[in-house]
Amino acid sequence: MKKYLAITSKGLENLLADELIALGVTDPKVVHAGVKFEAPIEVVYRCCLWSRIASRFIQILSEFDVRDDMDLYLGASSINWPSYFSADKTLVVDFNGTNREIRNSQYGALKVKDAIVDRFTKADLARPNISKVEPDLRVHMRLSGEKGILGFDLVGSGLHQRGYRTEAGRAPLRETLAAALVMRSTWDESKPLLDPMCGSGTLLIEAALMACEMAPGVKREKWCFEALNDFDAELWAEIRSEARVKSRRGVKKVDARFYGFDRDYRVIQTARENARRAGVEDLITFDVGDATKVECPEGFENGVILCNPPYGERLSTEPALIALYSEFGRQLKEVFGGCTASIYSSNDDLLACLRMRADKQFKLNNGALPCVQKNYSITESAERKEAVSIEVAPEFMNRLKKNIGKIGKWARKEKLDCYRIYDADLPDYNAAIDVYKDYIIIQEYAAPKTISEDKARRRLTDMIRATVLVTGVETNNVILKVRQKQSGKNQYQKLAEKSRYFDVEEYGVKLIVNLQDYLDTGLFLDHKLTRKMLGEIAAGKDFLNLFAYTGSATVHAACGGAKSTMTIDMSRTYLEWAQKNMNTNGQTGTQHQFLQADCLQWLQQADGEFDLIFIDPPTFSNSKRMEQTFDVQRDHIMLLENLKRMLRENGTIVFSNNKRNFKMDEAGLEKAGLKAKNISKQTLPLDFARNKHIHNCWIITHKED
């Protein structure tokens, strides 16, 4: 008997071996990402037609050592290729793997092709043509270290191409992988199956095909083994005919029901089309639905929930997934008690959010991505246990509830859309949580090096889950950012090109924020009282805003009746943002000026006069566009001396900065002819009361003679 290699995904080797035994193979041998076996051609044909989890079947022609390209050529040349196929057949060489000498798969494929063609030429036969588009034959060369396997791919295009799927939803599963997940899910034909995040319906369709005893390759038109000299057309026709009859009978006798839900109506339409092409549309009910709200269908008491939720490769960029898994887990326990669930994901942290203990788990790659499938029993006892311990991170939840009760009431009274509800109150949960209208930003501070990465991630996961539970915020409206000590060029780091702008209200003023594109949002929440104060004292005054950022202080001053405003920042992006802020509040006209400039340089040569000046410089800056470094502790007197030249006799400078333990140089200030009053306490809002050093703020005026 001839030798064969069945190829599959890593982690499915034993499952494939069992499947091949059921199809008539004896003594299969498991190898890495495959199974080797010997079998008569009838069994091989059945395996190609009926295997649900093999991706390819290779007829092994030779196994040989490959140290270099000469070994490769000689090994391929040793095969009597004309005895296997005729020269009128087109072919392509698929080369997989490299070693120290053969580092390029295209080069390896070329050497094998040369050996095949040369063998025909030496036999005085025509050269077979090479075709990369639908060739009659595919020659398969697999190289692992110095060991090579050379043979024919009996299938052609991968066996996952069943013929029923032409398009898919997000990140579709290969059909072979989907079939494996069904096999390991605890589902059998006696049970109903539900996929609450079904996408294009692949999991349900594969299960329905199993229930119908429909061969996965029955709709496939082309097989590469048909181009081989020893192809038995009569035997193959008999095996295919038998499979078609079995499929038709199977559809009629199936009692199992299948249910698929997805939030995207267009994806549901695609799933219905896929089921129709697969011939199982009458068995599957597809509907638009939210996995976190899905109800148990009638007669589903012993059913199986199987799904492949979105899992994202980076937890830090997908906080909504934490909330999704948390709510989904709660829904499973509340609605599907007595059923079983099988969830496939690459992220153990997300699976932990389900708050369920797996009975069994299987490691199984999705392509190159390591993933795991976990099976859960959703028992009544588990449901009661969850009811007792429904709170996640109870200490954190209790603090958050308390803060929201106090700060939320104050914010509503003050007419504030944006405020902080948590500011690293508890040492184990080191983050700031801000409300921006209907959105919540969780700003995680970098964990100390003494805390393990796994523990830090688990605490972050718990924080996000608890925040969603306490606030009731929509999961897609949770945004996660990691905050670290900022310096120089990453002070206002751009994050992504999502461009999500919207208006918020602050003491009757409308301001534009952007929660996605930058590390900061366009609004420093700790300065809300400072901005309010500026608006209250700006009437009839010429106002200057330096290091203006998005100009929110200018907007308050203008809305408070300022005679004129000058807004200066080095960033064109922020100046344009400031102009939009002003326009949103109807503050237009030539009395409102905007200037892109290095504020430090501008101060050295400016000669205007102002009644009210607001300056909130960075603690430290070494921007490439600034000609010098700036340190607010070292340079604040120089800064204020320059401002004094432009300050009218009864004018006021509101000077603020965020340097912890900042000390005003009172002697230097007096020498400069200025005096200062510390108003930090008056400008510290309730939502920042715990962080008394978030900023310091001063009223600077001319010293009286």
From Swiss-Prot:
Principal location class: cytoplasm
- All copies of the THUMP domain together span 43-154
Going by the UniProt record, its keywords in alphabetical order are:
Cytoplasm, Methyltransferase, RNA-binding, rRNA processing, S-adenosyl-L-methionine, Transferase
Location relative to the cell: Cytoplasm
Q: Which InterPro entries match?
A: 23SrRNA_methyltr_KL (IPR017244), DNA_methylase_N6_adenine_CS (IPR002052), RlmKL-like_Mtase (IPR000241), RlmKL-like_Mtase_CS (IPR053943), RlmL_1st (IPR054170), SAM-dep_methyl-trfase (IPR019614), SAM-dependent_MTases_sf (IPR029063), THUMP_dom (IPR004114)
The region annotated as signal peptide is none
UniProt entry tagged with the keyword RNA-binding: yes
What the entry lists under Gene3D superfamilies is as follows: 3.30.2130.30, RNA methyltransferase domain (HRMD) like (3.30.750.80), Vaccinia Virus protein VP39 (3.40.50.150)
Give the GO molecular function terms. 23S rRNA (guanine(2445)-N(2))-methyltransferase activity; RNA binding; rRNA (guanine-N7-)-methyltransferase activity
What GO CC terms are in its UniProt record? Answer: cytoplasm
Write out the catalysed reaction: guanosine(2445) in 23S rRNA + S-adenosyl-L-methionine = N(2)-methylguanosine(2445) in 23S rRNA + S-adenosyl-L-homocysteine + H(+); guanosine(2069) in 23S rRNA + S-adenosyl-L-methionine = N(2)-methylguanosine(2069) in 23S rRNA + S-adenosyl-L-homocysteine + H(+)
Reply yes or no: does the keyword Methyltransferase apply: yes
Pfam families named in the record: Methyltrans_SAM, RlmL_1st, THUMP, UPF0020
Task: Report the domain of life of the source organism.
Answer: Bacteria
Function according to Swiss-Prot or TrEMBL: Specifically methylates the guanine in position 2445 (m2G2445) and the guanine in position 2069 (m7G2069) of 23S rRNA.
What is the name listed in the Swiss-Prot or TrEMBL entry for this protein? Answer: Ribosomal RNA large subunit methyltransferase K/L
Question: What is the species of this protein?
Answer: Aliivibrio fischeri (strain ATCC 700601 / ES114) (Vibrio fischeri)
- The gene that this protein is the product of is rlmL
